[in-house]
């Protein structure tokens, strides 16, 4: 299969991105893992531009057709691509709203035991006042342990279904929420945005039918950053944390910011999506706010740390594997698993390895 690589220092053209999308569709991997192949090929072939209007409207039209046919899963998948990677245009923002609505219709159709929970958040003047998450329980277990999981820049709580199911199959309840600065998160990503997790952890602890005194944490892609930070700043509340391809320090330095603007593993607008997550209004603000996330510079890496598993592909071009080596040189010992390939090290054993490790921390800790 032909591999598309963006030329150094520039984004892909429309034609190059169409090839990239077809490759992802054929492989059935993110962000096209749930799309109907025939219908998706037609949308890809008919794309006229990568700007927010052209992109959002093309995929939303496909979503509307799927909705009209009662095909909620494909409608959800099309609306997700319509806002991908971030809703930085009105057409993409409209797609993001429909993405959430159709996800709940999918849950209803498939008879998932899914509850959308909203809890208060004591936000600042420019922040939201509540945080929403999806709560699911494994059947037949009276008081299961629980893991909170979140995605990264473009994979939000609605894209965590496969990982949620893996935890449910392992007898673990799940709380799926949005990474700070994405989806329905009430905050932007900032050096103290871990505040958004506290009311969620409090909610889990207060449920009499959950073993929520010390929970598991699972951060996917950029979300692994928060799993790492929470393991260091709230170790008494966390039984174990998994950082699946998250950064720590090197990722936020100027040289990596420039080197990772146009990685071959990412479709488009990675810097724009990161900037929106940070609440940045321009590239200079993006660079400044990204640098402020360094856990090394924040001085927390020598703090006692909850059990922490660091996972990534060996040749990640979005998050430097040097951050894993850095974390091993500071503070408490950590567990590490590298997999072949690039960002996140996708493969048949990746998610099962992480789920088994986290289950051991939750169930075997006594």
Where do the language-model regions lie?
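N-terminal cap/lid segment of alpha/beta-hydrolase-fold proteins
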Residues: 52, 59, 94-140
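Short beta-strand element of the alpha/beta-hydrolase
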Residues: 143-152
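Alpha/beta-hydrolase active-site loop
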Residues: 159, 166, 187-210
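Conserved alpha/beta-hydrolase
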Residues: 167-184
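Hydrolase active-site cap/lid region
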Residues: 232-289, 306, 338
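Short beta-strand/loop motif that positions the catalytic acidic residue
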Residues: 303-305, 310-312
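Conserved alpha/beta-hydrolase "acid-adjacent" motif
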Residues: 317-323, 346
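Catalytic histidine neighborhood in serine/cysteine hydrolases
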Residues: 329-345
């Amino acid at each position: 299969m032909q591999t598309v690589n963006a030329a150094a220092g520039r984004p892909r053209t429309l034609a190059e991105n169409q090839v990239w999308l077809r490759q992802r569709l054929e492989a059935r991997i993110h962000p096209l893992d749930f799309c109907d192949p025939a219908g998706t090929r037609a949308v890809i072939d008919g794309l006229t531009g990568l700007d927010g209007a052209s992109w959002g409207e093309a995929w939303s039209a496909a979503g509307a057709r799927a909705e009209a046919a009662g095909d909620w899963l494909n409608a959800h998948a099309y609306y997700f691509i319509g806002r991908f990677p971030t809703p930085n245009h009105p057409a993409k923002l409209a797609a993001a709203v429909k993405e959430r609505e159709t996800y709940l219709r999918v849950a209803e159709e498939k008879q998932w035991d899914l509850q959308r929970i909203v809890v208060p958040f004591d936000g600042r003047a420019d922040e939201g006042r509540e945080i929403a998450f999806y709560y699911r329980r494994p059947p037949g277990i009276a008081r299961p342990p629980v893991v909170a999981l979140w995605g990264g820049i473009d994979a939000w709580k609605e894209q965590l279904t496969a990982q949620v199911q893996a935890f449910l199959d392992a007898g673990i309840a799940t709380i799926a929420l949005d990474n700070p600065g994405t989806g329905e998160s009430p905050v932007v990503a900032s050096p103290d945005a871990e505040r958004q997790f506290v009311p969620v952890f409090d909610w889990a602890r207060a449920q009499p039918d959950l073993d929520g005194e010390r929970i598991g944490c699972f951060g996917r892609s950029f979300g692994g950053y928060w799993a790492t930070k929470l393991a260091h700043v709230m170790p008494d509340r966390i039984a174990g944390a998994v950082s699946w391809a998250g950064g720590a320090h090197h990722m936020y330095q100027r040289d990596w910011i420039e080197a990772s603007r146009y990685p071959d593993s990412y479709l488009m607008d990675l810097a724009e999506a990161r900037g929106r997550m940070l609440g940045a209004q321009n590239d200079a603000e993006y660079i400044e706010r990204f640098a402020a996330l360094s856990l090394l510079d924040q001085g927390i890496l020598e703090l006692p740390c909850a059990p922490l598993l660091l996972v990534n592909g060996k040749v990640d071009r979005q998050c430097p594997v040097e951050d894993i080596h850095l974390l091993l040189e500071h503070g408490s010992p950590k567990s590490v698993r590298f997999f072949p390939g690039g960002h996140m090290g996708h493969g048949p054993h990746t998610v099962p390895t992480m789920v088994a490790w986290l289950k051991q921390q939750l169930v075997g800790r006594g």
